[in-house]
């Protein structure tokens, strides 16, 4: 599901700048076969998607990226739901994938951050800015997420690069850092919102009290600040 042009650009930036922290904000693996819609529809093509290849590609990218934190996105969260499935085969498969992910992050000494919407347990902080996968999905998601958290924030849930100020007395800003997925995925081809999807990432500087966030929109030119 990842776009090699986007992932290669991000890896190039990471190797050039060598940041102290490198956080992947979620959906590193697709797990399409575990999608609720695919489970309900016996004719869904996603039911035949190879989870082993998907998992290997995602973990290989995270290892090459040398992440220090991996935030679970709503795609990875499918595993948490299915780990308690009454179907023993499904629950075993979900548990096996979770264990594989945990082993890979243990080898990197990286933290796995759980997915919990906008709750505190799914957020991590640098300076005055919260980082999370995100859960709001609308055209003002950057603004609304910053308002919901009452904080500056960086997230990726809606797959586009955007920055919006919150409607609050304190000057909070929401940063949407884009994605590295193929921009023309079949499962969302009927959604007009996919036309605003863009490859990108966030980077910056931080202290104990402040965080300066810079957004990079890669598509369509893929020009890096190197």
PLM features per residue range, with description:
Residues 2-108:
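Core catalytic region of metal-dependent phosphoesterases/phosphodiesterases
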Residues 4-5, 112-115, 134-137:
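Short gly/ser/thr-rich secondary-structure transition/capping motifs
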Residues 8-11, 56, 117-120, 138-143, ...:
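A generic local structural motif
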Residues 22-25, 67-73, 114, 131-133, ...:
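A structural signal for short, well-ordered beta-strand segments and their strand-loop junctions
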Residues 42-47, 124-130:
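Short, basic, glycine/proline-bearing loop/turn elements
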Residues 78, 82, 216-226:
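C-terminal/domain-terminus segments
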Residues 86-127, 158, 179:
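Active-site-proximal loop/helix segment associated with metal-binding centers of metalloenzymes
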Residues 128-216, 222:
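Conserved beta-sheet core of the metallophosphoesterase superfamily
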């Amino acid at each position: 599901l990842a776009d090699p042009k986007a992932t290669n650009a991000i890896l190039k930036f990471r190797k050039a700048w060598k940041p102290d922290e490198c956080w992947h904000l979620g959906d590193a693996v697709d797990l399409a076969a575990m999608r609720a819609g695919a489970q309900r529809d016996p004719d869904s093509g996603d039911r035949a998607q190879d989870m082993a290849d998907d998992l290997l590609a995602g973990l290989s990218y995270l290892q090459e990226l040398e992440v220090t934190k991996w935030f679970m996105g709503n795609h990875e969260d499918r595993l948490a739901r299915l780990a308690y499935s009454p179907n023993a085969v499904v629950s075993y498969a979900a548990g096996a994938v979770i264990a594989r992910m945990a082993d890979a992050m243990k080898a990197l000494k990286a933290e796995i951050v759980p997915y919990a919407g906008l709750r505190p347990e799914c957020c991590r902080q640098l300076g005055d800015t919260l980082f999370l996968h995100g859960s709001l999905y609308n055209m003002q998601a950057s603004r609304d997420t910053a308002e919901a958290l009452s904080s500056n924030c960086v997230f990726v849930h809606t797959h586009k690069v955007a920055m919006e100020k919150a409607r609050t007395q304190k000057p909070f800003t929401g940063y949407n850092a884009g994605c590295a997925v193929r921009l023309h995925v079949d499962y969302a081809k009927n959604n007009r919102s996919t036309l605003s999807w863009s490859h990108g990432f966030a980077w910056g500087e931080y202290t104990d009290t402040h965080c300066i966030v810079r957004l990079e929109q890669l598509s369509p030119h893929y020009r890096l600040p190197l």
